[in-house]
Amino acid sequence: MSEGNDQDAGKGRLSLRPAGRMELGRTVDAGSVRQSFSHGRSKVVQVEVRKKRGLQPGTPSAPEGGSSSAPAPQSGNAPQGTPRSGGGNRGSGRGGAGGAGRALTAQELAIRQRVLEQQRVEAARREVERREQEKISILSAAEEARRREEEAKRAAEEEARRKEQEEADRIAAEAARKAAESAPPAEAPPVPPPAQRERTAAPSSRSAPSRTAPSDDIRRPSRPAPIPSKVPVAAPSAPQTLRLRERGDEGEEERKPRRAGGGGAPAPRKAAAPVAKKAVAEPRRGGRIDVRAAIEGEDERTRSIASMRRQRDRERRQAELERLRADQLKVVRDVVLPETIAVGELANRMAVRAADVIKQLMRMGMMATVTQTIDADTAELVVQEFGHRVRRVSESDVEVGLEGISDIDSDLQPRPPVVTVMGHVDHGKTSLLDALRATDVAAGEAGGITQHIGAYQVTLPSRQKLTFLDTPGHEAFTAMRSRGASVTDIVVLVVAADDGVMPQTIEAIKHAKAANAPIIVAINKCDKPGANPGRVRQELLHHEIVVEDMGGDTQDVEVSALKRQNLDKLEEAILLQAEVLDLKANPDRAAEGTVVESRLDRGRGPVATVLVQKGTLRQGDIVVAGAEWGRVRAMLDDKGQQMKEALPSTPVEILGLAGVPSAGEPFVAVENESRAREISEFRQRKIREKMAAGIAAGRGTLEQMLSRIQAGAQKEVAVVIKADVQGSAEAIATTVQKQEHEEVKVRTLLSSVGQISESDVQLAKASNAVLIAFNVRATNQARELAQREGVDIRYYSIIYEVADDIEALVRGKIAPKQREKFLGYAEIRKVFEITKVGKVAGCMVTEGVVKRGCGVRLLRDNVVIHTGELSQLKRFKDDVKEVARNYECGLSFAGYNDIKEGDVVECYETELVPA
């Protein structure tokens, strides 16, 4: 063996002999294993195992000098507080000897007390610090325990993953070993010289070995030697690596085959198939350090599988930490909440899942679905729970900024006054306006009364303009008078000199005071023989109207519309009052005003009479009037002439609206159609909701309806109202509602303007309603349908006729009432007991008559003790129909026998009378 080693050394081959050329160092342990060959042969070979260096991170390696010793304390630095040997003892001795028999002075005592107090304060401070330190220690210990628990949990998970990986590696290694055993044994070829080996290293390692060498020394097993499962770790004190190089080729990069012993045969190689499988199927095992890698010269420090696992675990934990941080950094949003919102829409606005919103609602005790609608308060609580900001909005926000900004004084210009003429019916309001306008409107009015609100503009000889609103005086037109007073600047109160103050005059005074409008009293009909203007002034005092003649500040003018007397004085009074008010408006802005009246014209469609109060209305403007909108296609004045623009205080008729707006609604010009459509849709939706709520409230609960039907009290009169203008339809609806009775309900199914159509007839037929047509007619198709279906269409032109007919209808629905009629009294003089009949009272009729079958009340001491009917009425033994006063008779009561002498019988009968 030694000769072989020397020979190998001389040839420049590897050797395991511990000579000066090859050193294993302190990181390699040597051992021997027995290799088994074919035909029962075996041989002992030497094996070197490279040990893994087990350095802990952060631990410095020991110095090469060997053992390390702690630095000795310096002798020159003495501890603080240690008395010096020498003078200290001497001084102490002197102090002790000098102060043994002397008392402390006051200064020394104060110093000592101060020192003791400082010591107590210091002790208290240290105690507080100790307690705080204990609290911190407890919290730190809890945090450390939690951290250790988490680390233990992670370590357990890593250990489980490691075991699974090791089991997979073991199964793969076992499969590779079985594949290597099943392969035929391979023989190594002879080792070529170094120069030739450098050229043919790669091809020869893959070629099949020759089988012509019969010597046992050169035969090697086909499988490598077993590797110990646990490789001992080298001590960290000697950082050395195993480098196996040829004697003369230390710088050569090519790896040389290993020599097992003294023979010159090359080291055995593994079969090609297992090597390829290992390189392809398990690439992660390429960095593992084994015996073969150490022998072949793979001396670089590569990363182990455990290190790679730790790196992957660190990366996974880092990614998990970043994900958790991303979840914690939530985006706070401004969530806009309307009055009602669906659950799904709320989730979308918060950018969360709808399921999370539903869970939160369930925690709040509310079961909801994705499509269910919740109110704004509940939605606000949910948004706050998710950590977002809430911004509440209302559907009415679409009207914000609709009226524009306030005008500045420099933009204001004088405007004509708006004068409303009010008063009682038939006091001459329209005639007075006709006299001022030089027209004859009153002659064409039905019934001689005004039933529409009219708007006119008069130009005086002085070129000044006055705008007049003529309001109806009938009691049914309260809403019209209220609208006129709300948009007016001056109220002209017309009172007939021969009639005085009447109910509608009082109502007009209240409307004017509510609108805070000044009043000018026009005492009309002063040309009539019975005129008494003084009485009118006296009656006005009862309503706090004090004219100037009586020391007040209210102007009064005695006029005659028929004779056109003092009309100029009335105009002067109006102009004077307007000058006092100093009326101004800004014409250079979007138009605003009020709808005075509206109607549905057959040829022109919806027509609205509006009064411009601010700005200038031009043809082509987009306006919103109440719940309707449209573009102004045409404008007409009170004389029917076309206009291009309307300045403030100008009444005009506008065409082009989508529908008939309600009278009294404001109108405003907007910038575009989308804004107008949005506002109109919002207002129409509000009207529908209000109507639905009113219907539901009027209907009541199902139990209430059933109880009314069973009691026979569910009676109603249904009406469908069609009028020429919106104000008349409104007045008729109000008049109809006033005719209600406690037993009969009057219900207005429809109140609109325009002709009667087939749909109106069908509605009246379905609900058994009366169709009221006020100043309108039915179409031919509607008339024929009404005749076939038997629908009653009633035409009217005067409003009080409508009120009379509806009152008659309601009275016809009321059931007749029972009225009690007194007959007489009878006094019981004697009581008889008769078999099979019971007690019979012998009576004397003291007042009136007693009739058979009448109702009776039995009075005892003026207290009613029984109410019933007479069963028998006899005189002596004969049955009679009635007994007159001062005659005796016998009475018996149906089902009652508790009668005594001295009781009084009151007799009466009931009769039906119409309600």
Curated annotation (Swiss-Prot):
Annotated ranges, domain tr-type G: 414-584
Listed NCBIfam families: IF-2 (TIGR00487), small_GTP (TIGR00231)
Region span, G5: 560-562
Skewed-composition ranges (Pro residues): 186-195
G1 as annotated region, ranges: 423-430
GO molecular function: GTP binding; GTPase activity; guanosine tetraphosphate binding; translation initiation factor activity
Protein name in the entry: Translation initiation factor IF-2
HAMAP family named among the record's database cross-references: IF_2_B
PROSITE patterns according to UniProt: G_TR_2 (PS51722), IF2 (PS01176)
Family designation: Belongs to the TRAFAC class translation factor GTPase superfamily. Classic translation factor GTPase family. IF-2 subfamily.
Compositional bias ranges of the Low complexity kind: 57-81, 201-213, 230-239, 266-278
Region: G4, residue numbers: 524-527
Keywords: Cytoplasm, GTP-binding, Initiation factor, Nucleotide-binding, Protein biosynthesis
Chain residue ranges for the region called Disordered: 1-105, 121-295
Regions of compositional bias (Gly residues) in chain numbering: 84-101
Compositionally biased intervals (Basic and acidic residues): 121-135, 143-180, 243-256, 279-295
Gene from which the chain derives: infB
Subcellular location(s) of the protein: Cytoplasm
Pfam families named in the record: EF-G_D2, GTP_EFTU, GTP_EFTU_D2, IF-2, IF2_assoc, IF2_N
Region listing for G3, in residue ranges: 470-473
Binding, GTP: 423-430, 470-474, 524-527
Role this protein plays: One of the essential components for the initiation of protein synthesis. Protects formylmethionyl-tRNA from spontaneous hydrolysis and promotes its binding to the 30S ribosomal subunits. Also involved in the hydrolysis of GTP during the formation of the 70S ribosomal complex.
Region (G2): 448-452
GO cellular component, one term: cytosol
